[in-house]
């Protein structure tokens, strides 16, 4: 079965992609009759060296994303994973020569088709009297023994674009640029890993992987790698990659050792999430610095992809200060990252958080008995939420993410850990404030924010008094804050529905009289739980569920169910203690 792609046609997808890039970038223009993109200011290059690169499409943003001042002059693109036509390469060489450039350097990845086609175009151009040189980049560190075809050209090619571009912008001649980038190309290596393959438009995936396998040392055309290893943590996979790349017994290794200075590239092969990319980058930095390697610059993003392949490649380039200045040189290329020109290693990566303000004395602080009662209440709430994790997750799946139970369990475990560390504050106001901060930090998601808002606001009326009227006012304040910032109202199918129903029952506490808790408990719980159950017949008016068709929402809202369960746990403990 072929994979789905958002294209107009399989045959025209490479042309359409290049046209889209040029349409949105005024600094680029197409060469009529060819799949070639050039700088739109070619006339400004008179007397300088032109830089041309390219290859098959499907590696975006490479290579056309790196056209610009300080990088490439132009790019010749082939069909997906197919070398560009000789005629188009020659047309690009002629175009930059006619603009008054003093020579052209072809930067070519080491693949047979690219070498042949760029090489043939070079020979034809030279026969016409155009000075043209060619550098073939092979930075693949996958193979431990030398292959006749040499090392494949991978993401390190982009660094060659950058170095050559900086030299050309500085007015360096063709021969010197060729010699210098040839040296640089030998001082780097790249290794890729992927969780699965990719698929050319109109075709099936290029290879199959088991659910517990990853492919190591693969190229950028969907071809299989050199080794399949078992799925592991990001740290373990990164360690495997970097150990392989720097192993001196590997003929294609990068000779990195303690004290070396490197540029690190963490390259998304197309389908990896940026969350995963950040985790990989962190693992790579920690691994290298743990070996005493200085990371002069770290470039993280998508530089050379393989369509939608969910994988990553790591590139290491050994650098000194002169080379680093070329990496840092200004460029207008759209796909080059605008990173700070400072070393990654040795930089302070965190700063102390502001100190919490001292707590004001609380006149409502109660005795030890009340504190123990609060512990029992919180313990029951935690046990209740942990027991509901699977049920709440199941209810939440209708809204898309299915993590309501997990979120509430995370809150419960955070509270349990907090209770083990120290007894809770005796003051109700301070207790609610502390719980608010804890949930905001540990619970996460909109639920954590809403509970945090509720508890922060509810704490305010309890600073002066803790009688029944104050607790009713606290409930009102919490509900008001949730409505103000959460933009929810009763009837919107949220946790507010359960809490609102309970709040209406608590209005009776504002009237003078005896302890009404035993009388209220049954009615309060019945109303709160009925309100939670009623949410299954409501159309969501707030929260993530509001974006889901009401036809799919035929179960109670998980937040409302959780809130009702919390109320039951609280009131049952208080009633059992005779509060």
UniProtKB/Swiss-Prot annotation:
Q: Name one GO biological process term.
A: glycerol catabolic process
Tissue pattern of expression reads:
Detected in kidney (at protein level).
Enumerate the Pfam families for this protein.
Dak1 (PF02733), Dak2 (PF02734)
Q: What is this protein called?
A: Triokinase/FMN cyclase
* Database matches in PANTHER family: TRIOKINASE/FMN CYCLASE, TRIOKINASE_FMN CYCLASE
The record's similarity note reads: Belongs to the dihydroxyacetone kinase (DAK) family.
In this chain, dihydroxyacetone is annotated as bound at: 56-59, 109, 114
Residues where ATP binds:
401-404, 446-447, 486, 494-495, 557-559
Please give the GO cellular component terms listed in this UniProt entry: cytosol
As cofactor, the record names: Mg(2+); Mn(2+); Co(2+)
Q: Which reaction does it catalyse?
A: dihydroxyacetone + ATP = dihydroxyacetone phosphate + ADP + H(+); D-glyceraldehyde + ATP = D-glyceraldehyde 3-phosphate + ADP + H(+); FAD = riboflavin cyclic-4',5'-phosphate + AMP + H(+)
Query: What remark does the entry make about the cofactor?
Result: Manganese or cobalt are requested for FAD-AMP lyase activity.
Recite the lineage of the species.
Eukaryota, Metazoa, Chordata, Craniata, Vertebrata
**Record-annotated DhaK domain positions:** 9-336
Q: Where is this region: Disordered?
A: 346-368
Mention one GO molecular function: metal ion binding
EC number(s): the record gives 2.7.1.28, 2.7.1.29, 4.6.1.15
Post-translational modification Phosphoserine, affected residues? 350, 511, 546
Instruction: Keyword check for Flavoprotein, yes or no.
Output: yes
Q: How does activity depend on temperature?
A: Optimum temperature is 60 degrees Celsius.
Q: What's in the keyword line of the UniProt record?
A: ATP-binding, Cobalt, FAD, Flavoprotein, Kinase, Lyase, Magnesium, Manganese, Metal-binding, Multifunctional enzyme, Nucleotide-binding, Phosphoprotein, Transferase
User: Which source organism does the UniProt entry give?
Assistant: Sus scrofa
């Amino acid at each position: 079965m072929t994979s789905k792609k958002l294209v107009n046609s399989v045959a025209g997808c490479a042309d359409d992609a290049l046209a889209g890039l040029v349409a949105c970038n005024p600094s680029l223009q197409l060469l009529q009759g060819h799949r070639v993109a050039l700088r739109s200011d070619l006339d400004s290059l008179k007397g300088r060296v032109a830089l041309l690169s390219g290859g098959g499409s499907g590696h975006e943003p490479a290579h056309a994303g790196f056209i610009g001042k300080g990088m490439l002059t132009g790019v010749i693109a082939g069909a997906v994973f197919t070398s560009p036509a000789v005629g188009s390469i020659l047309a690009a060489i002629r175009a930059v020569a006619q603009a008054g450039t003093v020579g052209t350097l072809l930067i070519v990845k080491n693949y047979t088709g690219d070498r042949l086609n760029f090489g043939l175009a070079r020979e034809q151009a030279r026969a016409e009297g155009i000075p043209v040189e060619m550098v073939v980049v092979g930075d693949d560190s996958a193979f431990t023994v030398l292959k006749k075809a040499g090392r494949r050209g991978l993401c390190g090619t982009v660094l060659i674009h950058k170095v050559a571009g900086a030299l050309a912008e500085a007015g360096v001649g063709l021969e010197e640029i060729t010699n210098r980038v040839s040296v640089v190309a030998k001082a780097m290596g790249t290794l890729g890993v992927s969780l699965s393959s990719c698929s050319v438009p109109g075709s099936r995936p290029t290879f199959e992987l088991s659910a517990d396998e990853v492919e190591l040392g693969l190229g950028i055309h969907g071809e299989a790698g050199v080794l399949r290893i078992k799925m592991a943590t990001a740290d373990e996979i990164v360690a495997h990659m970097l150990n392989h790349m720097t192993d001196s017994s590997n003929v294609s290794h990068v000779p990195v050792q303690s004290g070396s200075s490197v540029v690190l590239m963490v390259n998304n092969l197309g389908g990896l999430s940026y969350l995963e990319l950040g985790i990989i980058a962190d693992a790579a930095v920690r691994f290298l610095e743990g070996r005493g390697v200085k990371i002069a610059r770290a470039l993280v993003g998508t530089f050379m992809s393989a369509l939608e392949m969910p994988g990553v490649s790591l590139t290491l380039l050994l650098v000194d200060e002169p080379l680093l200045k070329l990496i840092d040189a200004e460029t207008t290329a759209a796909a080059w990252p605008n990173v700070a020109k400072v070393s990654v290693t040795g930089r302070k990566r965190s700063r102390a958080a502001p100190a919490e303000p001292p707590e004001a004395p609380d006149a409502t602080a109660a005795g030890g008995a009340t504190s123990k009662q609060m512990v029992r209440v919180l313990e029951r709430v935690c046990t209740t939420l942990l027991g509901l994790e699977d049920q709440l997750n199941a209810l939440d799946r209708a809204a898309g993410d299915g993590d309501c139970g997990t979120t509430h369990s995370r809150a419960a475990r955070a509270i349990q850990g907090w209770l083990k560390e120290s007894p809770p504050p005796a003051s109700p106001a301070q207790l609610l404030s502390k719980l608010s901060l804890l949930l905001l930090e540990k619970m996460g998601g909109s639920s954590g924010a809403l509970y945090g808002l509720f508890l922060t606001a509810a704490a305010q009326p309890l600073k002066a008094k803790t009688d029944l009227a104050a607790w009713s006012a606290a409930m009102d304040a919490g509900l008001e804050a949730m409505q103000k910032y959460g933009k929810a109202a009763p009837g919107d199918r949220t946790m507010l529905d359960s809490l609102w129903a309970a709040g209406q029952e608590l209005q009776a506490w504002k009237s003078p009289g005896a302890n009404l808790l035993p009388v209220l408990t049954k009615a309060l719980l019945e109303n709160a739980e009925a309100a939670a159950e009623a949410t299954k017949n409501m159309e969501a008016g707030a929260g993530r569920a509001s974006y889901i068709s009401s036809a799919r929402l035929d179960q109670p809202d998980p937040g409302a169910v959780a809130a009702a369960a919390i109320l039951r746990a609280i009131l049952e403990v208080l009633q059992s203690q005779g509060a």
